[in-house]
Regions:
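Bacterial Sec-dependent N-terminal signal peptides
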Residues: 1-24
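Phosphate-group recognition and catalysis centered on beta-loop-alpha active-site segments
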Residues: 16-252
Length: 252
């Protein structure tokens, strides 16, 4: 239904015109550029692949183990082992689909340091215990700062608690909220730098991109893989598109 709406908008000619832009600077690779031979989601190779195609940034996810190791992984469990309740030793030998080990955040950041000025879009995953989110953020901020990557790292989360905690403890950091239940004004009042919402949220609230821009917020949309839909959001003035097709999006 949402794509039908977009196609109708295109046919009616009501899409807002936009000036020509360098699309590469507007594209974020979702969990890295993993749709290539020999790579996998949230792997170090997917991070390196993102750099090779020259887009704005590489998105990835972090959790913290019971014994304090921050790992880069999307799901909250690894082969049925709940990351939040496990020690790192319980998952350290598990492999991604391409055979790589699940990266520690420290390893991921070390690889990122070698990749020019590409942005790191770091998602703090929701944890069952908010105290574990706090532990995850504290450890993450420490590692990012020690790696000298604070100016290249932007933070996102579905957890309002996590976003608020980052704003409080790293007020110079760019934080965008993912959950889609705050208006641009509410996000601004919370101290966030932007809104990073699913495509359907912007379809349901067509004025939010413009409102966010007027408030000085950045806007991102996820996870959009249909090229017509990506083009629609570019024409609407979205700042960034998070996609599993970063190389194709860059070429639009």
């Amino acid at each position: 239904m949402k794509r039908l709406f977009i196609y109708i908008m295109l046919l009616m000619g009501v899409i807002l015109p936009s000036a020509a832009k360098n699309r590469a600077k507007q594209v974020i690779a979702h969990r890295g550029y993993w749709k290539t031979e020999g790579s996998a989601q949230n792997s170090i190779s997917s991070l390196q692949n993102t750099y090779k195609i020259g887009v704005y940034g590489s998105e990835f996810d972090v959790h913290i183990t019971r014994d304090g190791e921050v790992v880069v992984f999307h799901d909250d469990d690894v082969e049925g082992i709940k990351i939040e309740n496990a020690n790192y030793a319980d998952i350290k030998d598990k492999r991604l689909k391409n055979g790589e080990r699940i990266p520690k955040l420290q390893e991921y950041l070390a690889a990122a340091k070698l990749l020019g000025n590409m942005k790191l879009i770091l998602e703090v995953k929701e944890h069952i215990q908010k105290s574990d989110e706090d532990r995850c953020i504290d450890a993450t901020l420490k590692m990012v700062n020690e790696a000298g990557l604070a100016d290249r790292t932007e933070y996102i989360s579905f957890s309002k608690h996590a976003c608020d905690y980052i704003v409080q403890h790293a007020p110079k950091s760019k934080v965008s909220y993912l959950n889609g239940d705050l208006s641009p004004r509410e996000a601004k009042e919370a101290g966030y730098a932007g809104i990073d919402y699913e495509d359907s949220v912007y379809i349901d609230h067509p004025s939010w991109i413009k409102e966010a821009r007027q408030l000085g917020l950045v806007t991102n949309v996820w996870t959009v893989n249909d090229l017509k839909e990506i083009k629609y959001f570019f024409r609407q003035g979205i700042d960034y598109v998070t996609t599993n097709e970063p190389e194709k999006a860059k070429a639009l």
